[in-house]
Amino acid sequence: MSLEIAYAAMGGDLETVRKRLMTDERIEKFAKIFLQDTSMQTLESALESGDFSEAYRGAHTLKGVSRDLGFTPLFEAACALSDALRLDEAGTPANLAAVPELLPAVRDAYALVVDSIAII
């Protein structure tokens, strides 16, 4: 029951994840492992240091993990940020000006996921 509450709290897609991971025990296991993932920290520190390649990697990884675990709002926010940070051939982010606008949504969604996992 706490899994349903956690996914409802974060606006996640539990039914799709159940099809992918098959058991609630596996979903709980991987959700808790997510708390050890360093993609958000990588993203934040890379943005602070101006390392856009590493920032893109952090956002892209966060996007993939959140998609796989059905953390829908985080996936959507990380997807938009990842697209903005995608580097062109010259190594310039696609839409660097959008990053300050997009980052708060990623932070908020990430915090919500972390808080929701605590319910499990």
Task: Name the predicted role of every residue range.
Residues 89-91:
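Alpha-helical linker/edge segments of TPR/alpha-solenoid repeat scaffolds
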Residues 12-61, 93-120:
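Long, amphipathic alpha-helical coiled-coil segments characteristic
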Residues 6-11:
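N-terminal helix initiation/capping motif
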Residues 1-5:
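Intrinsically disordered or compositionally simple regulatory linkers and C-terminal tails
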